Design a protein with these regions (language model features):
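Substrate-binding pocket helix/loop in short-chain dehydrogenase/reductase
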Residues: 83-85, 89-94
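C-terminal helical subdomain
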Residues: 164, 180-215
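Conserved glycine-rich cofactor-binding loop
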Residues: 9-10
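Conserved glycine-rich Rossmann-like NAD(P)H-binding loop of the short-chain dehydrogenase/reductase
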Residues: 23-38
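Active-site helix of classical SDR
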Residues: 108, 142
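Rossmann-fold cofactor-recognition segment
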Residues: 43-57
Length: 236
């Protein structure tokens, strides 16, 4: 099995690369950080591929030598919070949309044609898409786009299985900067285990940790006006 993973230089992506390699897959670990890629490349069964996921031509050039993949995991992403919605920062919004959503489109154009018939496409979104949360205007909008994109692809792709991943809080270098509590947060290693298990079963959606995501799913039955009142009361 040949598995390509974007955002493989840290967090969930790094753990996925290591674990799939340990299972015997040939892993193409992709990212921008050459030093971290070099470290990953020391593992057996891991090849590295350096590119910027927000640059279509960069992706195409870097992956030109690869003709097919059994599994592509689009995991690259970033998070920035809107601290002052009244003075909306469009540059911040553009950065987050570019990294989290537009990069998906670029990767799909470059990589989807190379996924073998019967292969798998895995797209990592976020459980933030279940409900609107404070300061998440940019991050939530970008991940909501990813979720809708994955669901539509699951309808239109007839020979590739699509798995949409909705993680809860995961302890990674990205979330280390969060200045608020992260209930039921799991390690990146545990998150990778959830994803690998769900992907192996070709689930349409993988969400975790289950208790946390099921609570969020249940809260969606509330009237929007009531949820907005609750959300306004959440601490920063």
């Amino acid at each position: 099995m040949i598995t390509l993973i974007t955002g493989a230089t840290s967090g969930i992506g790094e753990q996925l690369a290591i674990k799939y390699a340990e299972q015997g897959d040939t892993v193409i670990a992709c990212g921008r950080n050459t030093q971290k890629l070099a470290k990953l490349g020391k593992h057996n069964n891991i090849e590295t591929c350096q590119f910027d996921a927000t640059n279509l031509q960069d992706i195409k050039a870097a992956t030109l030598g690869y003709t097919q993949f059994d599994r592509v995991i689009l995991n690259a992403g970033n998070c920035e919070y809107v601290d002052d919605a009244r003075n909306f920062d469009s540059a911040l919004f553009e950065r987050v949309i570019n990294v989290n959503l537009l990069s998906m489109g670029y990767c799909l154009e470059a990589l989807l044609p190379k996924i073998v018939s019967g292969g798998q496409l895995v797209m990592v979104s976020s459980s933030v898409t279940y409900l609107p949360l404070p300061r998440s205007e940019a991050y939530g909008a970008s991940k909501a786009g990813v979720s809708y994109l994955a669901k539509s692809l699951a309808i239109d792709l007839t020979d590739v299985d699509v798995t949409l991943v909705h993680p809860g809080f995961v302890k990674t270098p990205l979330t280390d900067k969060n200045d608020f509590p992260m209930p039921m947060a799991v390690t990146a290693e545990k998150a990778a285990n959830y994803i690998i298990k769900g992907v192996a079963k070709r689930r349409k959606e993988v969400h975790f940790p289950y208790r946390f995501t099921l609570i969020l799913k249940a809260l969606r039955i509330l009237p929007l006006s009531l949820w907005l009142k609750i959300a306004k009361g959440l601490t920063r």
